[in-house]
Swiss-Prot record:
This is ATP-dependent RNA helicase RhlB. Keywords: ATP-binding, Cytoplasm, Helicase, Hydrolase, Nucleotide-binding, RNA-binding. Residues 406-418 have a biased composition (Low complexity). It is an enzyme of class 3 (hydrolase). It catalyses: ATP + H2O = ADP + phosphate + H(+). A motif (Q motif) lies at residues 9-37. GO terms for biological process: RNA catabolic process. ATP binds at residues 53-60. It comes from Aliivibrio salmonicida (strain LFI1238) (Vibrio salmonicida (strain LFI1238)). It is found in: Cytoplasm. Pfam families: DEAD (PF00270), Helicase_C (PF00271).
Length: 434
């Protein structure tokens, strides 16, 4: 982290348990970010919070430190059974759940507390084996958590800490009934520490907090501007005929170290991926129907730099912590203004600068006024020279489906099997920076 992203508040001065501090120190976390500096004193005093902070502000570490600290300082309920976790952390997507677990690993090692994951897209047996051995902290998505509950693998009667991350996204994805199902099977709000985090504390999010929390304190950390002052924004108005050529031309000009391209539909993502893969870029595809193991592999390759470009739907826009993303391309302007902020928030994180390039095309330019109203500024517009666009580009690679007979009995849930091939397009030599 750079100094611009942290405060003078040190974790060591907050009164955290030594084992928790050891876990933080192991990852090099010494000073707090603003959300950590505001939230942790409240949580360590035993007060519930409803926190407003965007992804990339350090909120995950705030609720993890508070969760582990509370479990270390609070006796387990008398007569607690092996099927009863003491803390539950709910996330809207499996990628976010996995990321939270990964962020918790140093605290798991330093405290000796046991944690497990529960999310869809992976076979029950592997997750069930870990859960059956007994866990202190269960991290996952609501659907799979409820499945384990209904099978009698877990119950919520010994819950002492609850975390609801990306609460606004939970509403967007229609998970609110699942959330209430879980909450209503726990001890009363006064008997547990409750944390809710959301990019926006809308009326519906605050209503949820009022219903299932004990007089939560509102902790708000808002950036100077919604899109982050370290992100350079740029807007083009391409025709539909020029859109793909403009994208490939800009990639050739910018040659980003690590870029995410967002499109609004799975079909459009596959089309963009096909063009870039045919042009020998090292590109990965992340959409909702990519099998979980493949998703994890793609994200790992992208994080390690083995893949330079990730083409994604908004499934990747929230919660994923991928450091050093240099460019975000909005191939399609999102239909929801808030998603623009979440998308470009993949870059310009932790004090780093970033670039956002958006296309206001014939189909999605209608979304621009709402986006600019929401971010409270106009996106700087750039023109392009049609004669300078790349020509003679190869035909896109088409993703192929398995023959229908090979997809029976849920063998691959109808997922596309090709794609995400690793390409080795040589990078051009970088010109000296002016």
């Amino acid at each position: 982290m750079k100094k611009t992203h942290i405060t003078e508040q040190k974790f060591a001065d907050l009164g955290l348990e030594p084992q928790v501090l050891d876990g933080l120190n192991a990852k090099g976390f010494i000073n707090c970010t603003p959300i950590q500096a505001k939230a942790l004193p409240v949580l360590l005093a035993g007060q519930d919070i409803a926190g407003q902070a965007q992804t990339g502000t350090g909120k995950t570490l705030a609720f993890l430190a508070a969760t582990f600290n509370h479990l270390l300082t609070t006796p387990a309920p008398e007569g607690r059974k092996i099927t009863q976790p003491r803390a539950i952390i709910m996330a809207p997507t499996r990628e976010l759940a996995i990321q939270i677990y990964n962020d918790a690993e140093s605290l798991i090692a330093s405290t000796g507390l046991k944690a497990a994951l529960a999310y869809g897209g992976e076979r029950y047996e592997k997750q069930q084996k870990v859960i059956e051995a007994g866990v202190d902290i269960l991290i996952g998505t609501t659907g799979r958590i409820i499945d384990f509950y209904k099978q009698g693998q877990i119950d919520f009667k010994a819950i002492q800490v609850v975390v609801l991350d990306e609460a606004d996204r939970m509403f967007d994805l229609g998970f609110i009934k699942d959330i209430r199902f879980v909450f209503r099977r726990m001890p009363a709000p006064a008997e547990r520490l409750n944390m809710l985090f959301s990019a926006t504390l809308s009326y519906r999010v605050q209503e949820l907090a009022f219903e299932h929390m004990q007089e939560p304190e509102h902790v708000v950390v808002e950036p100077d501007q919604k899109t982050g002052h370290l992100i350079t924004e740029e807007l083009f108005y391409p025709s539909n005929d020029h859109k793909m050529a403009l994208l490939q031309t800009l990639i050739e000009e910018e040659w980003p170290d690590r870029a995410i391209i967002f499109a609004n539909t799975k079909h459009k993502c596959e089309l963009v991926w096909g063009h870039l893969a045919a042009d020998k870029h090292r590109v990965g595809l992340l959409t909702g129907d990519v099998p979980q193991k493949k998703r994890e592999r793609i994200l790992e390759e992208f994080t390690k730099g083995e893949v330079d470009i990730l083409v994604a739907t908004d499934v990747a826009a929230r919660g994923l912590h991928i450091p050093q993303v240099t460019h975000v391309f909005n191939f399609d302007l999102p239909n929801e203004a808030e998603d623009y902020v979440h998308r470009i928030g993949r870059t310009g994180r932790a004090g780093e600068s970033g670039n956002s390039i958006s296309f206001a095309c014939e189909e999605y330019a209608i979304n621009l006024p709402a986006i600019e109203e929401y971010i409270e500024h106009s996106i700087p517009q750039s023109d392009y020279d049609t004669s300078a666009l790349l020509e003679d580009l190869p035909a896109p690679i088409r993703l192929q489906r398995r023959p229908p007979q090979n997809r029976r009995n849920g063998s691959n849930n109808g997922q596309r099997q090709s794609g995400n091939r690793k390409h080795s397009r040589p990078r051009p030599p970088r010109s000296p920076q002016a």
